Amino acid sequence: MKRILVCGLVPDVGGLEKIVLDFYNHIDTSEFELEFLLQGPEDVEFSDHFKKLCHNPLVVHRIPKLRPHMKQALKEWDRFFKENAHRYDILWSNQNGLTHLEFLKLAKKYGIEKRIVHGHCATADKFYRFIHPINRLFVGKYATDFWACGTEALNHFYHGQEREKALVIHNAIEVEKFIYNQEKQVQLRKEYGIPEDCFVVGQVSRLYEKQKNQSFCVKVFSEIVKKEPNSRLVFIGRGDTEFLENVAKEYGVADKVIFTGLTTNVGKMLNILDVFFFPSNFEGLPIVLIEAQANGLPVVTANHLPDARILNNYDKSLSLNDSLEEWADKILSVRDHRELDTAKVKQLIDENGYEIESATKQLEKLFNE
């Protein structure tokens, strides 16, 4: 039995949390025991949404956040690792950026032999662009294994010897949960008051403007409406709706933008869409792009983002600097390109390494090395 301490997750479910959860739900729990380290107050818990998605026991340990009282927090972190490190064979540190190396440092200091850093993002936001490249120089001093969700993330996280050793671990999914279902599409559109013959564009993601660039979606949608008035923009996820509502009002499309809120069933909700639109400012290799393609959806994303192409109806030809009208035309041009051959979809996802059972076997093999 290998015992693994999982770090870097937050209490709610974002892309990173969902990736780790999917692996945990499929891992052989007779061979691997995972425990989770959360930052926050003593009563911090994973959200009900997280717990609902998790099918295995959740053992959670808590340490304080680094900020604003970093000195005191680091003392508590040191105490936790000093008292508990002997219980673990592996540290699995999941990170969107190399904002700090403390988990890896403490794991090494107190004798956790296998120390994995797993990169989930291919660019850093402005706040971390200074510290990430510095920590990139030293990550090899503390980690033993170097993983990334894709080639772009691998190059962003590692250089030199670490890059040569690094492995790509695909963000894998349970394909059957995402296969297109026309009956569910009809049902969902009725539920949200969308006419059956309406053109629906949208995305699944946390509403987080700095990264996800959702105001750009609204602006492009305002151009789509000029060309196809019978259209809707659907945001599936929770976050700052007020900001986007104001943008929608400014561009005159407030009555055509729908916020569904949080969902525990992404596969079902994807059926409501005709095109998946994802013009983020930065990403690693978003699992939602794999999920959207499993649903057969045409995907339109920006050309600076990592390439998650599996199906031929995946388009990343445009830049965020291109005009709103060009984006609108591109989205409308693929509106009828949903891939309905489910056998083909399943085969391509498996061949590209995104099928969860195969990916979990790879993960288990690496944990055992």
Describe the predicted segments one by one.
Residues 262, 281:
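Aromatic "clamp/platform" in nucleotide-sugar-dependent glycosyltransferases that forms part
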Residues 142-180:
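A short, active-site helix/loop in glycosyltransferases that binds the activated sugar's phosphate group
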Residues 76-79, 179-194, 337-338:
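A short helix/loop element that forms part of the nucleotide-sugar donor recognition site in Leloir-type
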Residues 2, 6-14, 18-75, 239-241, ...:
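N-terminal strand-loop element at the rim of the active site
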Residues 17-22, 199, 203-223, 242:
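A conserved mid-protein helix/loop that constitutes part of the nucleotide-sugar donor-binding site
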Residues 298-302, 307:
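Short hydrophobic beta-strand element within catalytic cores of glycosyltransferases
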Residues 245-261:
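Nucleotide-activated donor-binding/catalytic signature segment of Leloir-type glycosyltransferases, i.e.
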